[in-house]
């Protein structure tokens, strides 16, 4: 059963009515945009959201493996494992995935933004991008702390290496710049190599 805020939000999602040979058909706006190969990644990156994004990517690949997919991102970040599920699927499928930052792409959101197809990663002019090192929290026996600390360091190194590959920045620059929260404007993100261009308007 849906909780009250979720049901209210769902009720506010606009519906689009289309005329077909069989009569009228209505879609929620996100389903209609999915038909145009547009996916929205909005809010916290977590397991349920990642499963939905992965499913949409795989569906659109099955529909047409040669046509580009657009992923619009407005996210404060979230789970590394959920984000990596989306990232790996973006790299795995055949269609190019273009990424567009609307609003913000922070933490794992910025990582996914940079993971779009080369030449097809964009920011809208007033969006913000933030990169930093992965956050880790752990509760348990003292003997397990070292194990989890080592795991976090391994994840940090992996993410930094992937960011270096996508941005063209040297690894030592990525390590320095992700040591603390590092906020960038759209233009700064383009200069850094997280995106390829800033979209002012459709061409």
From Swiss-Prot:
<dbReference type="InterPro" id="IPR033135">
    <property type="entry name" value="ClpP_His_AS"/>
</dbReference>
<keyword id="KW-0720">Serine protease</keyword>
<dbReference type="InterPro" id="IPR001907">
    <property type="entry name" value="ClpP"/>
</dbReference>
<dbReference type="Pfam" id="PF00574">
    <property type="entry name" value="CLP_protease"/>
</dbReference>
<dbReference type="InterPro" id="IPR018215">
    <property type="entry name" value="ClpP_Ser_AS"/>
</dbReference>
<dbReference type="GO" id="GO:0004252">
    <property type="term" value="F:serine-type endopeptidase activity"/>
</dbReference>
<keyword id="KW-0378">Hydrolase</keyword>
<dbReference type="GO" id="GO:0004176">
    <property type="term" value="F:ATP-dependent peptidase activity"/>
</dbReference>
<comment type="function">
    <text>Cleaves peptides in various proteins in a process that requires ATP hydrolysis. Has a chymotrypsin-like activity. Plays a major role in the degradation of misfolded proteins.</text>
</comment>
<dbReference type="GO" id="GO:0006515">
    <property type="term" value="P:protein quality control for misfolded or incompletely synthesized proteins"/>
</dbReference>
<feature type="active site">
    <location>
        <position position="132"/>
    </location>
</feature>
<feature type="active site" description="Nucleophile">
    <location>
        <position position="107"/>
    </location>
</feature>
<dbReference type="GO" id="GO:0005737">
    <property type="term" value="C:cytoplasm"/>
</dbReference>
<dbReference type="InterPro" id="IPR023562">
    <property type="entry name" value="ClpP/TepA"/>
</dbReference>
<comment type="similarity">
    <text>Belongs to the peptidase S14 family.</text>
</comment>
<dbReference type="InterPro" id="IPR029045">
    <property type="entry name" value="ClpP/crotonase-like_dom_sf"/>
</dbReference>
<keyword id="KW-0963">Cytoplasm</keyword>
<dbReference type="GO" id="GO:0051117">
    <property type="term" value="F:ATPase binding"/>
</dbReference>
<dbReference type="GO" id="GO:0009368">
    <property type="term" value="C:endopeptidase Clp complex"/>
</dbReference>
<protein>
    <recommendedName>
        <fullName>ATP-dependent Clp protease proteolytic subunit</fullName>
        <ecNumber>3.4.21.92</ecNumber>
    </recommendedName>
</protein>
<comment type="subunit">
    <text>Fourteen ClpP subunits assemble into 2 heptameric rings which stack back to back to give a disk-like structure with a central cavity, resembling the structure of eukaryotic proteasomes.</text>
</comment>
<keyword id="KW-0645">Protease</keyword>
């Amino acid at each position: 059963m849906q909780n009250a805020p979720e049901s209210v939000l769902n009720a506010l999602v606009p519906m689009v009515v289309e005329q077909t040979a069989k009569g009228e058909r209505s879609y929620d706006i996100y389903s209609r945009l999915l038909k145009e190969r547009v996916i929205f990644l909005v809010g916290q990156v977590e397991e349920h959201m990642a499963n939905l994004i992965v499913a949409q990517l795989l569906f659109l690949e099955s529909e047409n493996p040669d046509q580009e997919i657009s992923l619009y991102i407005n996210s404060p970040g979230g789970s590394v494992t959920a984000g990596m599920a989306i990232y790996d699927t973006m790299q795995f499928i055949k269609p190019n995935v273009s990424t567009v930052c609307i609003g913000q792409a922070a933490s794992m959101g910025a990582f996914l933004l940079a993971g779009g197809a080369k030449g097809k990663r964009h920011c809208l002019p007033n969006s913000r991008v933030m990169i930093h090192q992965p956050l880790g929290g752990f509760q348990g026996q003292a003997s397990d702390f070292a194990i989890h600390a080592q795991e976090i360091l391994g994840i940090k190194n992996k993410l930094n290496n992937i960011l270096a590959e996508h941005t063209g920045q040297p690894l030592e620059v990525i390590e320095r710049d992700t040591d603390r929260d590092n906020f960038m404007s759209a233009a700064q993100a383009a200069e850094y190599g997280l995106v390829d261009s800033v979209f002012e308007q459709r061409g």
